[in-house]
Amino acid sequence: MKCPFCGHLETQVVETRVSEDADFVRRRRQCSACDKRFTTYERPDVNFPVVVKKDGSRADFESGKVRASMMLALRKRPVSIEQIDNALLRIEQKLLASGLREIDSTKVGELVMRELKKLDKVAYVRFASVYRSFEDVDEFRQLLRDI
């Protein structure tokens, strides 16, 4: 596998772990040129449900977009990248287990909110305030009461 740091084509696997559910394999790799380490995740190639947006348009589910929105909500919070990746994997598993061909973007947002609530309450509030488009302070108060 190509090293993401220097582009060298030779890397060695130094550690391999199978997830608790045996749904994916996590591998730590080390570049033989620059000696830097990086993590890769190996999982089956599957078809996620198509996301139906609020305006009715459809788009492929993109894990990267979900991860980026979670990272933004979790910015400067004490949550590890591994915890975020595990939460993202749980979201993906729920989408696949649903058996649906299409899913509303609101359902995806709710899945993200559930995972953020487990990881970090502040990140949950950050995400919810944008996702639900809060208009006033009372909506924040209600959300905080629900936590």
From Swiss-Prot:
Binds 1 zinc ion. It comes from the Bacteria. Keywords: ATP-binding, DNA-binding, Metal-binding, Nucleotide-binding, Repressor, Transcription, Transcription regulation, Zinc, Zinc-finger. A zinc finger (unnamed) spans 3-34. The keyword Transcription regulation applies. GO terms for biological process: negative regulation of DNA-templated transcription. It holds the Pfam family Zn_ribbon_NrdR. Its cofactor is Zn(2+). InterPro entries: ATP-cone_dom, NrdR-like_N, RNR_NrdR-like. Residues 49-139 form the ATP-cone domain. Belongs to the NrdR family. Negatively regulates transcription of bacterial ribonucleotide reductase nrd genes and operons by binding to NrdR-boxes. This is Transcriptional repressor NrdR. It comes from Variovorax paradoxus (strain S110). The lineage of its organism: Bacteria, Pseudomonadati, Pseudomonadota, Betaproteobacteria, Burkholderiales.
